[in-house]
Amino acid sequence: MSDIVLEFATDLKTILGQNLSKIILYGSYARMDYDASSDVDLMVLVTLSDEEIKKVENQVFDCAFELEMKYGVDISPIIKNERHYEYWVDTLPFYRNIQKEGVVVA
């Protein structure tokens, strides 16, 4: 699994460059209670606006799909503006959960 995450992180650095702030692994892989049907959940935090995210999200999803085909494991990236995430992290249960259980991988 670490190979997938590292390869995905490397690809994202190429796609997003300095706009990539952080990649957080969360969910069953972060908790270490995954099984064969588990996907790799990743929160991708960027310094891009929502409009700019829409322009690059297909590249990110294509990258995830290529790695899914290579490794046979589903990758589920969510791309959010870092400021948006930080603003809501103490309010929204989903973001609180990522903050609590997540592992920063890049």
Each PLM stretch: what is its role?
Residues 21-29:
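Short gly/ser-rich loop at a beta-strand->alpha-helix junction or flexible surface loop bordering the NTP-binding
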